[in-house]
Amino acid sequence: MLFRSKTSGFKLAVDFDVYRDFADMERLAPYMDFFMISGSEELLPKFRELSCKYDCLFNISLAERGSVTYFKGQEFRVQAVKVDTVIDTTGCGDSYHAGFVCSYMLENDIEKAMRVGSEIAAETLKHYGGF
């Protein structure tokens, strides 16, 4: 199924979370539409490089530092939405990714999708447990 994703018309989003086998990730990149990972600034050069090679949105969540998305070598950055009182971070990244993917699928606007993801993640931070 993975290897038919680009030709079958459905979109594939994968959250690699903290997985760091870059050779394996690159092997899968041609079949994905949304490549998402949680990480740090040091990952950015690798994902910019991958975005120049594969037709996929590469999104790196940097927690309170916001997020970065690469598409065809172009970089997009959005700051995290400030939250006065953080109750629980459980599910925050998942909420961000859901908002990002849904917004992009509806609007086809990378920066807007990143802002929507950040807003939904900020709301999740205000509640106990995955929200």
Question: Which functions belong to the PLM regions below?
Answer:
Residues 6-77:
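Conserved phosphate/ATP/ADP-binding segment of small-molecule kinases
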Residues 47-131:
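Conserved phosphate-binding/catalytic region of the ribokinase-like
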